[in-house]
From Swiss-Prot:
The active site is at D245 (proton donor). It catalyses: 5-(methylsulfanyl)-alpha-D-ribose 1-phosphate = 5-(methylsulfanyl)-D-ribulose 1-phosphate. The gene is mtnA. This is Methylthioribose-1-phosphate isomerase. Catalyzes the interconversion of methylthioribose-1-phosphate (MTR-1-P) into methylthioribulose-1-phosphate (MTRu-1-P). Its EC number is 5.3.1.23. One of its GO terms (molecular function) is S-methyl-5-thioribose-1-phosphate isomerase activity. Substrate binds at R58, G59, A60, R101, Q204, N255, K256.
Length: 354
C-alpha cells in the first residue's frame, strides 16, 4: 500500500492505450499484454473494425472512442460536398464498425454522435468529425475522474475491494470506470486491499488489470474466479466494484461474463456491489436485461490458454461474453451524473429521462 497520499490521483494513472497521431490511430495490443507492450497502427476504418473484433482494443468506453476515430479514418476514403452527402457515403463503414461488438452500447452512442455531427456539418465536415472524436475522448476522461470521486465516497476507510475484468485506463480514455473508483479510493486512503479476479477465458483481470495497477504502484492480489465466494466469506472484501457494457432502464446491467455470479455471491455474504459506467452506457430504450443481445464468441477460446489447447478433442464449449446482473442485486450505480442507490426504473428515469 502507498500511504503517502498524493494530492493528485493522476499519480495512479500512467497507461494510455489509444493514441491519435493526427494521421492514423495507434492502439496498444491488449492481446499481448503483459509481456509484450506493442502498438498496432490503424490506417483505415476497416483496420479499426478488425481491431475491435479481434480484441486488440476492448472495454466499452475505449471501443466507442476508437470507433469515433474509425469514422474519421473512413471519411478520408470518400469525397462529399457536405455532411449530408458524406453521411450517406459513410453509412456502410459506420454499420461495419457497429457490428464489430454489438453488446457495447457506447459504440452505437458514439456512431450516433458522429451521424448527428455530419448531419449538421457543411463543407468542413471532415474537421467537424475530428473535433467530435477528440471531444468524445476528452469527455470520457473527465467523466471517469468524476465517477472516481463519487464512487470512492461510498467506501469506508480500511475497506477491501474485488474487481472483475478490466475497467481501467486500458478500457477507457484514461483513469477508468470501476478501476477509477479504486484509484480514487487508494489515493484517498479509503481502500486497504485490492483483489482482482482472473476473468476467464480472455484473462482480462490476470493479464490486464493487475498489470495496469502494477504500472501505477498499486498493490493488488489476483484470485481465481472460482475463489470469489471463499474470499467474501473470509471478510477481506467489503465492496465488489465492476463496470458495465450496458445498463437498462430498470437498472439491470450487462457486463463481462462472471459478473452476475459475483453479485449473487456478494448479496449472500453482505458485501456491497457497485456498478460504475459512464452515462453513455445507460440505454433507456432497453427496458430490462432480457432484451440485451448477448454476444457469443468462438467456443475455441474456452478450449485452451494462450493458444495452447488444454481440452480433449471433440468437446463442445459454450462461450457467452456477457451476462446480466439484475438491478435488485446492485447496491449502487455510479455515473458522472451521480450515484443511484438500490436502482430501479423510477430512479433511473429521474436521472436519465425517458
Amino acid at each position: 500500500m502507498h500511504h503517502p497520499l498524493p494530492p493528485d490521483d493522476t499519480l495512479y494513472d500512467q497507461v494510455r492505450p489509444i493514441l491519435w497521431t493526427g494521421h492514423f490511430l495507434k492502439l496498444l495490443d491488449q492481446r499481448k499484454l503483459p509481456f509484450v507492450v506493442e502498438y498496432v497502427e490503424c490506417h483505415s476504418s476497416e483496420d479499426v473494425t478488425q481491431a475491435i473484433r479481434a480484441l486488440i482494443v476492448r472495454g466499452a468506453p475505449a471501443i466507442g472512442i476508437v470507433a469515433g476515430w474509425g469514422a474519421v479514418l473512413a471519411a478520408r476514403e470518400i469525397e462529399a460536398v457536405d455532411g449530408i452527402e458524406a453521411l450517406r457515403k459513410l453509412e456502410p463503414a459506420l454499420q461495419r464498425l457497429h457490428a464489430a461488438r454489438p453488446t457495447a452500447v457506447n459504440l452505437a452512442w458514439v456512431l450516433a454522435r458522429m451521424r448527428r455531427t455530419l448531419s449538421a456539418a457543411h463543407a468542413d465536415w471532415r474537421q467537424a468529425m475530428a473535433r467530435e472524436a477528440e471531444s468524445i475522448a476528452r469527455e470520457d476522461l473527465t467523466a471517469n475522474r468524476c465517477m472516481g470521486a463519487y464512487g470512492a465516497a461510498l467506501i469506508p476507510i480500511g475497506s477491501g475491494v474485488l474487481t472483475h475484468c478490466n475497467t481501467g485506463s486500458l478500457a477507457t480514455a484514461g483513469f477508468g470506470t470501476a478501476l477509477g473508483v479504486i484509484r480514487a479510493g487508494i489515493a484517498q486512503g479509503r481502500i486497504a486491499r485490492v483483489f482482482a479476479g482472473e476473468t476467464r477465458p480472455w484473462l482480462q483481470g490476470a493479464r490486464l488489470t493487475v498489470w495496469e495497477l502494477q504500472q501505477d504502484g498499486i498493490d493488488v492480489t489476483l484470485i481465481a474466479d472460482s475463489a470469489a465466494a471463499h474470499l467474501m466469506k473470509s471478510g477481506q472484501v467489503q465492496w465488489v466494484i465492476v463496470g458495465a457494457d450496458r445498463i437498462c432502464a430498470n437498472g439491470d446491467a450487462a457486463n463481462k461474463i462472471g459478473t452476475y455470479q459475483l453479485a449473487i455471491t456478494a448479496r449472500h455474504h453482505g458485501v456491497k456491489f457497485m456498478v460504475v459506467a459512464s452515462a453513455a452506457t445507460v440505454d433507456m430504450d432497453t427496458t430490462a436485461g432480457e432484451a440485451i443481445e448477448i454476444e457469443q464468441r468462438d467456443p475455441e477460446e474456452l478450449l485452451g490458454v494462450s493458444g495452447v489447447r488444454t481440452v480433449a478433442e471433440g468437446i463442445a464449449a459454450w462461450n457467452p461474453v456477457f451476462d446480466v446482473t439484475p438491478g435488485a442485486l446492485i447496491d449502487a450505480i455510479v455515473t458522472e451524473r451521480g450515484v443511484i442507490q438500490s436502482p430501479d426504473a423510477a430512479q433511473m428515469r429521474a436521472t436519465f429521462g425517458n
